[in-house]
Design a protein with these regions (language model features):
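Catalytic centers of nucleases
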Residues: 18-112, 120-127, 161-163
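A short hydrophobic beta-strand->loop->alpha-helix junction that borders the nucleotide-binding pocket
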Residues: 46, 79-80, 240-243, 268-278, ...
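Sensor-1/coupling segment of RecA-like P-loop NTPase cores
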Residues: 121-124, 304-311, 315-343
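Charged, structured surface patches that assemble and position nucleic-acid processing machinery
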Residues: 131-186
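Amphipathic alpha-helical "lid/sensor" segments that cap RecA-like P-loop NTPase cores
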Residues: 244, 250-251, 332, 337-340, ...
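Conserved AAA+ ATPase "SRH/arginine-finger" region at the nucleotide-binding site
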Residues: 340-355
Length: 420
């Protein structure tokens, strides 16, 4: 089976809420493919939340969409795990004077109403019968001729899913078939569960872009130029910097609509840490994306120079359908004809200090500042020391050598193996 494929009957194992989320993710990807924000898609995320008959609501601020899985810019999806014969359709949307207000409103707005039935896998005549049942149910509405109706069965849903590799990664993971290491957009920097993970853009980290003539930008100044570079270039983009400067978190922010403006399309993001030997390999994944002509942004964390060089040449030759972002601690011999290099480095303790206060609120401002300054702004070193600070302890009187030794302590006991 191809990497981005799945047997349609496997979808039957999705729960109600997973089905709803799948449709929402597909709608987000479809909207983004048309050049609009995924934020145009709203869904409750809970089958128990009152929704008034709406599971997923798409509202794109334009008059018309190009033909595809979304036909009208205002579309309501109703997700159903069970089969939907004529009788079930009539119960769902009502008839005559009992017609659902949601349907009437969609008709008034010249919108679309689509039932997605996971339990159905219809023959052409079966789908025709269900569409007729939907049309008959709304025939008495004064605006019924303006309403677009459709019925998506399991085959239609799998056809839609095959168009969006990142959503395919998500659904395979939900079904326990996930590829080892590969992830859609998410918390790639792997913060502790339950911890606030908004981007810290305080002074203390600088970013140098290839076209910036060596100018060092603060994080909030660099986000939009980084996005513009990734959109415009047909070269691979290499993010370099020492371990602990926040490379992965900054790349994650490029897809975050709450950071800056005009975020990269998170619905096409495919991430992996190559240090964990992913299956399929990064080379196989890229080859598959290029062969199928899929739009994707591949992010390869901890990507060695040799692998980067191999993939960068393929991406550069193929055009802009697949964008490649790699992350690593140094540059080595990257070829400028196939690579744009963005360098990140620490420039003070501010970001590391704020991160410590966020992760260890009981550590106190003074301790956080002392650790961040000692770590020279390196977040990874600072976090490692902070983990070893006792409740109520003050670090003010500790020498640098004593702080350094904290890196080699396990539960208050020195660990010689770590030092070695």
């Amino acid at each position: 089976m191809a990497i981005f494929d799945i047997e349609k009957d496997e979808l039957l194992r999705l729960s109600d809420i997973q089905l709803e989320e799948l449709i929402a993710r597909l709608a987000e990807a479809e909207v983004a493919m048309h050049g609009h924000s995924p934020a145009c898609v709203n869904w409750s995320g809970s089958i128990t939340a009152p929704d008034g008959g709406i599971d997923i609501h798409v509202q794109v601020p334009i008059d018309q969409l190009k033909a595809g899985f979304l036909v009208r810019p205002d579309t309501v999806f109703q997700a159903k795990k069970h089969k939907m014969p004529k009788s079930a359709i009539e119960r769902e949307i009502g008839t005559g004077k009992a017609l659902s207000p949601i349907i009437s409103e969609q008709a008034r707005k010249q919108g679309s109403y689509i039932i997605v039935s996971l339990g159905d896998d219809c023959s052409p005549s079966g789908k025709k019968d269900r569409l007729k049942a939907m049309r008959d149910a709304v025939k008495d509405d004064p605006n019924e001729s303006y309403l677009h109706l459709d019925f998506y069965d399991r085959s239609k849903l799998i056809q839609w899913l095959r168009q969006h590799p990142s959503v395919m990664l998500w659904v395979k993971a939900k079904l326990g078939q996930g590829y080892s290491g590969w992830q859609p957009y998410g918390a790639w920097s792997n913060p502790p569960q339950g911890v606030i993970d908004t981007l810290i853009s305080a002074p203390g980290v600088t970013i140098t872009l290839p076209s910036g003539k060596g100018q060092k930008l603060k994080i909030d100044e660099a986000i939009n130029p980084m996005r513009a570079l990734i959109r415009s270039t047909n070269k691979a983009v290499r993010i370099t910097g020492l371990s602990g400067v926040g490379k992965t978190r900054i790349v994650q922010a490029l897809f975050d609509e709450t950071v800056g403006t005009d975020a990269l399309d998170r619905t096409v993001a495919i991430y992996v840490d190559t240090g964990y030997e992913p299956v399929p390999s990064a080379t196989a994944m890229l080859d598959n994306l290029l062969a199928e002509g899929r739009r994707a942004i591949m992010i390869l964390d901890n990507c060695p120079s040799e692998l980067h060089a191999s993939l960068a040449s393929k991406v550069s030759a193929a055009g802009k359908e697949v964008s490649l972002i790699t992350i690593e601690y140094d540059i080595r011999d990257d070829k400028p004809q196939t690579t744009e290099v963005i360098h990140i480095e620490t420039d003070g303790p501010d970001v590391a200090e704020q991160l410590l206060i966020r992760r260890f609120p009981s550590i106190g401002q003074n301790n956080a500042r002392r650790i961040a300054e000692f770590a020279d702004g390196n977040a990874r070193v600072a976090l490692a020391i902070a983990e070893r600070v006792e409740e109520g302890e003050s670090l003010a009187l500790l020498s640098d050598a004593q702080l350094f030794n904290r890196l080699f302590e396990q539960r208050n006991h020195p660990d010689g193996h770590l030092r070695e």
